[in-house]
Amino acid sequence: MEGFHEVVQTEWGKPLNTMLPIKRLHIKMARLAKGLKKWRKEKIGNTRLQLAITKEVLLQLEMAQELRPLSDQENELRKRLKARSTGLAVIEKSRMRQRSRLTYIRSGDANTKLFHMKANARRRKNYIHCLQKEGGLVFSQDEKEKVVGDYFSEHLGTSTARTLSLNWQALGYTPRNLQQLELPFTQDEVRHTVLEMPPEKALGPDGFTGAFFKACWEIIKDDLLAAINNLFQLHSQGFELMNSANIVLLPKKTDALRITDYRPISLMHSFAKNFAKLLANRLAPHLNSLVSNCQSAFIKKRSIHDNFLYVQSMVRKMHKEKMPTLFMKLDIHKAFDTVNWSYLLEVLRALGFGPRWCEWVSILFRTATSRVMLNGLLGPSFHHARGVRQGDPLSPMLFILAMDPLQRILEFATQMGALSPVPSSTARWRTSLYADDAAIFINPRKEDIDAIKVILQAFGNISGLHINLEKSSVHPIRCDEIDLDHVLTSFAGIRGSFPCRYLGLQLHTRSLRKVHVQPLIERIGQRLPGWKGKWLNRAGRLALVSSVLSAMPTYHLTVFPLAAWARKSIDKIRRSFLWKGEENANGGHCLVNWPTVTRPKDLGGLGIPDLNKFSRALRLRWLWQDWVDTSKPWAGMELPCNDLDRALFNASTRVTIGDGQKARFWHDSWLDGEAPKHLAPSLFELVRCKNRSIHLELRNNGWVAALRGQITTASQVEEFISLWIRLQDIHLTPGTPDTITWKWTANGAYSTRSAYRIQFCGSYRAFRSDLIWKAFTENKCKVFVWTMAREKILTADNLQKRGWPHQDRCALCNGPLETCLHLALLCPFTRAV
């Protein structure tokens, strides 16, 4: 906005008395915040009030025009007021869009009423009417503030003494070379961190968003760099002024009453958050080597599905092979809020983090202060004494480092004989960790249950991460002949069964039934009433269908293919909301058939994902990662891929053989880019073992010995001779691994996008739809033109096909029957316009 940068430049450049870089930055930001508030009040003011006044004056002028001609001054005033009204409406809509948090919808794709409604709904949802304490419910603001203040002062503001410590060498911890983490911060590094900041996230105590830092980088960069370099030198004077946060309480469930039913999210001061993000960016590339493979949260190239697929494969294998086992899900009490700082720093030192890095983490810890925001009002400030902030970019990484020793402790206990080994030969680990979701496989023995209780209690005393066994659960696998009442005598938790939920998905021993998938469909349908489709134009509904309704099943589709009935149910919801804005719509409301709508935009569709093709594209990643990353916990186990998935994968890849140990002789495309089973299909039918490696099949011509029966037909003889000749030129290279290349990307690596796109190979486009989507206009206009190009808008001819009331003649020119072609090009009225 005009004048903004001038105000920032003026306020930022005013002289200061202090020379301490951090205090200088704090004073400048506080002073600038006041200056911008004053400037906004003078420049913009109350937009809602101004907009209401402007509309009222315009209304009076229009009423006057009905009685008499307006004067020149009145016409000029009306012209200016209309321009002013448009500008104020844009500002108000943008402001309400930010408050509504519907950031995936553009301002032009929805009515301002929708943003108002969503903002009010969020406020009502997050408003805390009452809280429960030991004596009953409290309703007044003062009493609620006392309950909240006492709780956080006790849980975050006090630390507990450690009674035990760990022998890090016995657990296999050896210091790594992490000196590069302590290099000086460069201007490019800081600027990259600033550019990564989301522009419209919730404000911290200072009131500045990422958009401000990006827009004013040239003005503020010198002071920002000076403060960060001061922290690099471990001079933290004044940092406590900027390491503050406002804690907002978000309900975990609809009927939240206790303070524990709310999730505390810290809205940090932007400078402290920037510094934490700097450290997080440096640490992120090293996490893969620092954290065991049984843990996948917050680590690049690892996925939550890695944990689920490993556990799912283990459960199914143990059930199939009738191995009695207990699957235990652990509940860690307030994990992020209770981790002990001394323990966390011990973990960092054991891993090889240097003294400067550990001191940076200590500075972030010991200078942290917070205030709880209750219904928009801030409570008193308190100092932190333990835990890591939820909302701090560095906190998730520190937390997984703090959790990782649990896996090593359990493995050490197994080696020492305190726990008996898990019977399955494919079990790489008995533990699966994803942030604070922990799961363990245990043998159904009373001695193991007693031992695990002692180990978990000791881990809680060491780390502050106490396991709540009463809320933990045990799920037996093939334990029908075992006296579980005796085995679980000392276990006070929940005894469950399969299927059960783990990491948000159904963990099962057999195939999923309809009752297990139905909740997913219901959750998708439940999103529609809150959106009020009538306040959205079709482009806005398209954005919601593409970014929300189509994304909701993605987590499920990555592991489980949806049955046809489930896909149809979800498609019905998406189709109805797109065309009518409601959950149910009949065929007459749906202007274009669904297969056309779900094609990519450049192929004549609207770009809404086809769930069947998208699910297959997601599942191909398992086949790709099974090739390129053998360190995955599920490597070598059963994959959630069917024959069609494997056929598409083989057609989409090219294998370059080295030692022939990895590639499969018959299935992989390694022989001049083709698979031998396609070169010799008749011969392939005679093969006994179809999944052997190239190395085994070429050694002593093992592929010939693997043929069962006689080669009798002419086609079999021809294929045998052709394959024999081609194999004579193949020579393996011992010590060189086989490699695989994805055909549909420039860098040869798999991507979901390319796997989805290739499934439309052979499709044609009826018209140059790409010209529509490249046009410089609002999305609602693009969607309308796309519908008209398909000749599907509700002109008279289309109304006639549906049997709906209509006028035969064009309403604009009173000419022939109204059609899309006539309305767009042939109508004299349209051509004149």
List PLM regions with ranges.
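A helix-boundary/hinge signal
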Residues: 1-74, 84-87, 94-96, 100-106, ...
